[in-house]
Design a protein with these regions (language model features):
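N-terminal alpha-helical targeting/anchoring segments
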Residues: 1-128
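TRNA-recognition modules of translation machinery and tRNA-sensing kinases, especially anticodon-binding
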Residues: 121-422
């Protein structure tokens, strides 16, 4: 959410952000509604002043004037009741519009309507050159007996189950990522995979991406697609001390997404599934661009180091204004090479949101001067599986169809090669 004062004082800045990010929002309608709300509040204040005056005059008024004053007071009370009802409706509508207001992006963001305007800024590692015909990850699963095809009969499409060494490998990856983040000074948390609507509004997933989220029938809860939803709500309503910042968390939770709108995309294998496992980096900083940028670089470097330890070729993408989402100040994606597709696919998304989420979730701290301010938030994936398994299987496959284990994972697996499950 953007500060309403900023919107009033800099409407052209916000209008530009709406254009750059392709947000469907009529700013003039929002500002007109804001003026109506302010007018209603002013009139209610006038009425309250008049009622206070009448309340003081009634006891002193002569009998012939008292009845008229009482009638006037009742008329004002009735007017106030109607205006308060109108005010509640208009404030609710204004709040709905404010939730759609995008954060102006940082000046270095590529300008464009979608991912075609994204810019590659760095490439690390070379794609593998195989002296044998390489297999895609689906064939590797079939050849080694690492998948359980019957699960689709039980759980439907876009579900998966792993067997043997690959099941242990997935668990090893999660523990590896949590250990890595703990060594970096982040507090590890295991989190629930569900939250109330307010938490989704706080991150910005609601109302825009509500179709991507599954509600839990008969409750006020929804399944989360990332631990960010719960992490961002942990300090909602609190006023932290400046000395407590930054808060640095590594949250693990199973994640769920409906994949609405992805019909026909990645229908085979592990690339796009309904349930997956994700370790999320999350940082809460003071309201300072310097502090935010420092945390952004830290989150980015953590993700890069993880990919290097996994011995995967990757690149960094500076995300364009039209692709980054309404709440982002800056976004850099990390993409890993997929040999069977001959292209890079996203595995991480590093985002700085300044106070956009903090205002929605009411995340505050008290600065050194004693002022209460909204904090800044940032997040990035540490590791998400099974998508990362696609890259690991395909990039590290051996001529006989087995898969090499990166050196950093050998202590977790107790072996150097993933063996078939027969």
């Amino acid at each position: 959410m953007v500060d309403l004062k900023r919107i009033r004082q800099n409407p052209e800045e916000i209008r530009q952000a709406i254009r750059l990010k392709g947000v469907d929002l009529d700013l003039d309608a929002l500002l007109a509604l804001d003026r109506e709300v302010q007018g209603l509040k002013a009139r209610l204040q006038e009425i309250q002043t008049q009622r206070n005056r009448i309340a003081k005059e009634v006891p002193k008024a002569p009998p012939e004037a008292r009845e008229a004053l009482i009638a006037q007071g009742k008329a004002l009370a009735e007017e106030a009741r109607k205006l308060e009802e109108e005010l509640r409706e208009k404030e609710a509508h204004l709040q709905e519009l404010l939730l759609k207001v995008p954060l102006p992006p940082w000046p270095g963001a590529p300008v464009g309507p979608d991912d075609r305007a994204n810019v590659e800024i760095k490439r690390v590692g070379a794609p593998p050159e195989f002296p044998f015909p390489p297999l895609d990850h689906v064939r590797l699963l079939e050849k080694n007996g690492w998948g359980e095809p019957r699960v689709s009969q039980v759980s439907g499409s876009r579900s998966y189950a792993l067997r043997g060494d690959l099941a242990l490998y997935e668990l090893a990856l999660i523990r590896f990522a949590m250990d890595f983040m703990a060594k970096k000074g982040f507090i590890p948390l295991t989190l629930p995979s569900y939250a109330r609507e307010a938490a989704f509004i706080g991150t910005g997933h609601f109302p825009a991406a509500k179709d991507q989220v599954w509600p839990i029938a008969g409750t006020d809860l929804y399944l989360t697609g990332t631990a960010e939803v719960v992490l961002n709500a942990l300090h909602a309503g609190e006023i932290l001390k400046k000395e407590e910042l930054p808060k640095r968390y590594a949250g693990y939770a199973p994640a769920f997404r409906s994949e609405a709108g992805s019909f026909g995309k990645d229908v085979r294998g592990l690339m796009r599934v309904h349930q997956f496992h994700k370790v999320e980096q999350y940082v809460l900083t003071e309201a300072s661009l310097e502090a935010s940028d420092q945390a952004f670089q830290e989150l980015l470097q953590n993700a890069e180091e993880i990919l290097r330890l996994l011995e995967l070729p990757y690149r960094l993408i500076e995300v364009s204004t039209g692709d980054m989402g309404p709440g982002k100040w800056r976004q850099v994606d990390l993409e890993v090479f997929v040999p069977s597709e001959g292209r890079y696919r996203e595995t991480h998304s590093c985002s700085a949101l300044l106070d956009w989420q903090a205002r929605r979730a009411n995340l505050r701290y008290r600065d050194q001067e004693g002022r209460v301010r909204y904090a800044y938030t940032l997040n990035n994936t540490a590791l998400a599986t099974p998508r990362i398994l696609v890259m690991l299987l395909e990039n590290h496959q051996l001529p006989d169809g087995r898969v090499r284990v990166p050196e950093a994972l050998i202590p977790y697996m107790g072996k150097e090669v993933l063996e078939p499950c027969v």
